From Swiss-Prot:
An example Gene Ontology biological process: lipid A biosynthetic process
SUPFAM superfamilies on file: P-loop containing nucleoside triphosphate hydrolases (SSF52540)
Sites where the protein binds ATP: 68-75
Protein name, per record: Tetraacyldisaccharide 4'-kinase
Assigned GO CC terms: plasma membrane
EC number: 2.7.1.130
Primary gene name: lpxK
Source organism (scientific name): Burkholderia lata (strain ATCC 17760 / DSM 23089 / LMG 22485 / NCIMB 9086 / R18194 / 383)
Keyword Cell wall biogenesis/degradation among UniProt keywords: no
Family, similarity comment: Belongs to the LpxK family.
Source species taxonomy: Bacteria, Pseudomonadati, Pseudomonadota, Betaproteobacteria, Burkholderiales
Any GO MF annotation of the entry: tetraacyldisaccharide 4'-kinase activity
Length: 342
């Protein structure tokens, strides 16, 4: 595990910067990007032409994913979508890869699970939604296990897995943040897993800076809003972010796009010191013991990895809520019900 702000975090930051422009490094890596793109295209073609058959798990599947690497806001989107599907009369379940956990077979993630056993994002989703969550690198196996354990589930939401073509899907939603497709190059020359032109049913864009939407069809704004912070040791104790304005604050995040979390706090009137941790940082020990601050603000994704042994009274958790466009919800619901949206 890399230390905070260590080599891995610095490498992630360097690549993120390079992927936003077509500099010398990006051009040098384009031959590798061509190979990557060819392999990805062959795999897509194999399923599109029927040479490989996707597996129908018996209920509609909504995939919430991205075509770029790094965090874009998928997890709060999945949580909001599950709530919206419930409100529309569905009984949703969720499947995920379980990244960061040593998962080899389909595994249920419950509110009592540990992040090390099922992954931080699936655990957060389970705690926020109360819906059945199963994880496995083979999402088909995860979906089949979920259905066997919960036969009342009538729609499955796949957290990520856009490129997991073996899982048949009814709806594909692609989430972007303000970086969109970066320099437009495929990995490793750019951030793209697939071309921006890839088919999807709808695109969601979270851009807290300009709020502008790209001129793509079926594109909707995704608003991520921070709520009142809650105390890690006393979750019932809550404080509006504005109350931290006159305190010495450290903001720390082990997520795919930590700068977005920091920008959210700044937009709330705070001026925190910041620390970017590697994505899925394991928190084997307390990296904040030497920080002379009054409060430490962390993400919900990081909070689920901090067990009962953590006793740092300065830790506050900032929840984020996703607001989905009602037109997007209507589009998804109509597709799930087998009708074209009006």
């Amino acid at each position: 595990m890399s230390a905070p702000d260590g080599p891995l975090a610095r490498l992630e930051a360097r690549l993120t910067r390079e992927w936003q422009r077509r500099g010398a490094l990006a051009w040098a890596l384009t031959p590798f990007a061509c190979v990557f793109g060819l392999c990805a295209a062959l795999r897509r073609t194999a399923y599109a032409q029927g040479w490989k058959k996707p597996v129908d798990v018996g209920v509609p599947v909504v995939v919430v994913g991205n075509v770029t690497v790094g965090g874009t806001g998928k997890t709060p989107t999945v949580i909001a979508l599950v709530d919206a599907l419930r409100a529309a009369g569905f009984t949703p379940g969720i499947v995920s890869r379980g990244y960061g956990a040593n998962v080899k077979a389909p595994t249920a993630v419950t509110t009592a699970s540990r992040a090390s056993a099922g992954g931080d994002e699936p655990l957060l989703i389970a705690r926020r939604t109360g819906a059945p969550v199963w994880v496995c690198p083979d999402r088909v196996a995860a979906a089949q296990a979920l259905r066997a354990a919960h036969p009342d589930v009538d729609v499955i939401v796949s957290d990520d897995g856009l490129q997991h073509y073996r899982l048949a899907r009814t709806v594909e939603l692609v989430v972007f943040d303000h970086r969109l497709g970066g320099n437009g190059f495929l990995l490793p020359a750019g951030p793209l897993r697939e071309p921006l032109s890839r088919h999807r049913d709808a695109t969601l864009v979270n851009d807290p800076y300009s709020g502008a939407l790209p001129p793509w069809p079926d594109t909707y704004s995704l608003a991520l809003t921070p709520g009142a912070a809650w105390h890690l040791d006393q979750p019932a104790l809550r404080r509006p972010l504005s109350q931290f304005a006159n305190e010495r604050v450290l903001a720390a995040a082990g997520i795919g796009a930590p700068e977005r979390f920091f920008a959210t706090l700044r937009s709330a009137g705070l001026a925190p010191a910041t620390r970017a941790l590697p994505d899925h940082y394991a928190f084997a020990d307390n990296p904040f013991v030497d920080d002379a601050v009054d409060a430490i603000l962390i993400t919900e994704k990081d909070a689920v990895k901090l067990g009962a042994s953590w006793r740092d009274a300065r830790l506050w958790v900032v929840p984020v809520e996703a607001a989905l466009d009602p037109r997007l919800i209507a589009l998804v619901v109509e597709k799930l019900r087998g009708r074209s949206p009006a």
